[in-house]
Amino acid sequence: IAINHLEGHALSPRLADAGLRFPYALLLVSGGHCQILRVEGVGQYRRMAATIDDALGEAFDKTAKILGLGYPGGPKVERLACSGDARAVHLPRPLLGSSEPHFSFAGLKSAVMRARDSGQHRGEDIAASFQQAAIDCVIDRLQRALATMGEVTALVVAGGVAANQAMRGALE
Protein backbone atom coordinates (compact mmCIF):
# COMPACT_ATOMS: atom_id res chain seq x y z
CA ILE A 1 0.00 0.00 0.00
CA ALA A 2 1.49 3.31 -1.05
CA ILE A 3 1.27 5.91 1.70
CA ASN A 4 2.67 9.43 1.67
CA HIS A 5 4.67 9.72 4.89
CA LEU A 6 4.07 13.45 5.33
CA GLU A 7 0.36 13.07 4.63
CA GLY A 8 0.31 10.39 7.31
CA HIS A 9 1.69 12.91 9.80
CA ALA A 10 -0.85 15.49 8.64
CA LEU A 11 -3.90 13.23 8.87
CA SER A 12 -3.13 10.70 11.62
CA PRO A 13 -4.26 13.09 14.39
CA ARG A 14 -7.77 12.65 13.00
CA LEU A 15 -7.58 8.97 13.98
CA ALA A 16 -6.92 9.93 17.60
CA ASP A 17 -9.53 12.71 17.63
CA ALA A 18 -12.58 12.08 15.46
CA GLY A 19 -13.79 15.59 16.30
CA LEU A 20 -10.77 17.28 14.68
CA ARG A 21 -12.15 19.38 11.86
CA PHE A 22 -10.53 21.11 8.91
CA PRO A 23 -8.84 23.49 8.61
CA TYR A 24 -6.23 22.98 11.30
CA ALA A 25 -2.61 23.99 11.77
CA LEU A 26 0.04 21.27 11.80
CA LEU A 27 3.49 21.68 13.33
CA LEU A 28 5.51 18.77 11.96
CA VAL A 29 8.78 18.35 13.86
CA SER A 30 10.74 15.21 13.09
CA GLY A 31 14.19 13.98 12.14
CA GLY A 32 13.58 14.67 8.48
CA HIS A 33 11.08 17.51 8.44
CA CYS A 34 10.28 20.75 10.18
CA GLN A 35 7.21 22.40 8.69
CA ILE A 36 4.11 24.31 9.58
CA LEU A 37 1.12 23.47 7.40
CA ARG A 38 -2.44 24.63 7.14
CA VAL A 39 -4.34 21.37 6.64
CA GLU A 40 -7.44 22.32 4.68
CA GLY A 41 -8.62 18.81 3.77
CA VAL A 42 -7.38 15.43 2.61
CA GLY A 43 -4.76 16.20 -0.02
CA GLN A 44 -5.09 19.95 0.59
CA TYR A 45 -2.13 21.47 2.41
CA ARG A 46 -0.65 24.93 2.44
CA ARG A 47 2.93 25.15 3.68
CA MET A 48 3.43 28.17 5.91
CA ALA A 49 7.02 27.48 7.03
CA ALA A 50 9.77 24.94 6.36
CA THR A 51 13.40 24.37 7.25
CA ILE A 52 16.12 25.71 5.00
CA ASP A 53 18.75 23.34 6.40
CA ASP A 54 18.58 20.79 9.24
CA ALA A 55 15.25 19.52 10.51
CA LEU A 56 14.73 19.90 14.26
CA GLY A 57 15.01 16.18 15.00
CA GLU A 58 18.21 16.06 12.98
CA ALA A 59 19.57 18.96 15.06
CA PHE A 60 18.70 17.05 18.26
CA ASP A 61 20.45 13.95 16.91
CA LYS A 62 23.55 15.91 15.88
CA THR A 63 23.64 17.69 19.25
CA ALA A 64 23.51 14.30 20.96
CA LYS A 65 26.40 13.10 18.83
CA ILE A 66 28.43 16.24 19.62
CA LEU A 67 27.81 15.63 23.33
CA GLY A 68 28.70 11.93 23.04
CA LEU A 69 25.18 10.72 23.84
CA GLY A 70 24.50 8.43 20.91
CA TYR A 71 21.35 7.75 18.90
CA PRO A 72 18.44 8.40 19.00
CA GLY A 73 19.47 11.82 20.19
CA GLY A 74 16.19 13.56 20.97
CA PRO A 75 15.30 11.64 24.13
CA LYS A 76 18.92 11.63 25.30
CA VAL A 77 19.35 15.39 24.89
CA GLU A 78 16.02 15.95 26.63
CA ARG A 79 17.02 13.72 29.56
CA LEU A 80 20.42 15.44 29.94
CA ALA A 81 18.79 18.88 29.63
CA CYS A 82 16.64 18.15 32.69
CA SER A 83 19.72 18.53 34.91
CA GLY A 84 21.12 21.57 33.10
CA ASP A 85 20.64 25.33 33.16
CA ALA A 86 19.10 26.62 29.91
CA ARG A 87 20.58 30.08 30.57
CA ALA A 88 24.14 28.90 31.15
CA VAL A 89 25.25 28.84 27.51
CA HIS A 90 24.42 31.68 25.14
CA LEU A 91 23.26 30.05 21.92
CA PRO A 92 21.81 31.77 18.85
CA ARG A 93 18.15 31.68 17.91
CA PRO A 94 18.41 31.57 14.10
CA LEU A 95 15.77 33.64 12.28
CA LEU A 96 14.11 34.65 15.56
CA GLY A 97 11.96 37.68 14.83
CA SER A 98 12.49 37.37 11.08
CA SER A 99 9.53 37.76 8.75
CA GLU A 100 10.91 34.88 6.67
CA PRO A 101 8.72 31.76 6.91
CA HIS A 102 11.61 29.40 7.53
CA PHE A 103 13.34 27.36 10.21
CA SER A 104 17.11 27.10 10.43
CA PHE A 105 18.92 24.88 12.91
CA ALA A 106 22.36 24.35 11.30
CA GLY A 107 23.84 27.44 12.97
CA LEU A 108 22.49 26.37 16.34
CA LYS A 109 24.11 22.96 15.91
CA SER A 110 27.43 24.65 15.04
CA ALA A 111 27.15 26.83 18.16
CA VAL A 112 26.65 23.69 20.25
CA MET A 113 29.90 22.31 18.84
CA ARG A 114 31.75 25.54 19.66
CA ALA A 115 30.34 25.52 23.21
CA ARG A 116 31.51 21.95 23.72
CA ASP A 117 34.93 22.65 22.21
CA SER A 118 35.43 25.67 24.48
CA GLY A 119 35.59 23.37 27.50
CA GLN A 120 33.82 26.04 29.56
CA HIS A 121 30.38 24.41 29.81
CA ARG A 122 28.89 21.26 31.28
CA GLY A 123 27.15 18.94 28.83
CA GLU A 124 23.94 19.29 30.83
CA ASP A 125 23.98 23.06 30.38
CA ILE A 126 24.73 22.80 26.66
CA ALA A 127 21.84 20.34 26.22
CA ALA A 128 19.42 22.54 28.18
CA SER A 129 20.52 25.68 26.35
CA PHE A 130 20.21 23.96 22.97
CA GLN A 131 16.77 22.62 23.77
CA GLN A 132 15.53 26.03 24.93
CA ALA A 133 16.98 27.82 21.90
CA ALA A 134 15.30 25.31 19.58
CA ILE A 135 11.97 25.70 21.38
CA ASP A 136 12.24 29.49 21.23
CA CYS A 137 12.74 29.28 17.45
CA VAL A 138 9.80 26.93 16.97
CA ILE A 139 7.46 29.08 19.08
CA ASP A 140 8.48 32.22 17.18
CA ARG A 141 7.96 30.61 13.76
CA LEU A 142 4.67 29.09 14.87
CA GLN A 143 3.29 32.37 16.19
CA ARG A 144 4.16 34.10 12.92
CA ALA A 145 2.60 31.34 10.81
CA LEU A 146 -0.59 31.26 12.88
CA ALA A 147 -0.94 35.02 12.51
CA THR A 148 -0.98 34.73 8.72
CA MET A 149 -2.75 31.43 8.00
CA GLY A 150 -6.29 32.46 8.79
CA GLU A 151 -8.70 30.84 11.20
CA VAL A 152 -8.02 27.22 12.14
CA THR A 153 -9.88 24.82 14.42
CA ALA A 154 -6.82 23.49 16.24
CA LEU A 155 -3.06 23.24 16.42
CA VAL A 156 -1.78 19.70 15.94
CA VAL A 157 1.83 18.71 16.66
CA ALA A 158 3.25 15.59 15.00
CA GLY A 159 6.59 13.90 14.43
CA GLY A 160 9.18 12.46 16.77
CA VAL A 161 10.16 15.78 18.37
CA ALA A 162 6.51 16.20 19.42
CA ALA A 163 7.31 13.71 22.21
CA ASN A 164 9.73 16.20 23.81
CA GLN A 165 8.09 17.26 27.09
CA ALA A 166 9.73 20.68 27.18
CA MET A 167 8.44 21.37 23.67
CA ARG A 168 4.95 20.17 24.60
CA GLY A 169 4.96 22.35 27.71
CA ALA A 170 6.00 25.42 25.74
CA LEU A 171 3.28 24.81 23.16
CA GLU A 172 0.54 24.55 25.77
Spans of features found by a protein language model:
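A glycine- and small-aliphatic-rich helix-loop capping segment at beta-alpha/alpha-beta transitions
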Residues: 15-21, 40-46, 69, 169-172
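Short beta-strand segments
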Residues: 3-4, 25-30, 37-38, 158
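N-terminal small/polar loop signature for handling phosphorylated ligands or for N-terminal nucleophile
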Residues: 1, 13, 143-146
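A contiguous, well-structured pocket-lining segment that forms one wall/lid of small-molecule binding clefts
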Residues: 78-156, 161-172
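A short helix-loop
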Residues: 28-29, 35-121
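Short, active-site-adjacent cap segments at secondary-structure transitions
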Residues: 9, 35, 162-164
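General beta-strand structural signal in soluble alpha/beta enzymes
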Residues: 1-5, 47, 73, 157
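Conserved phosphate-binding catalytic cores of ATP/NTP-utilizing and phosphoryl-transfer enzymes
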Residues: 3-25
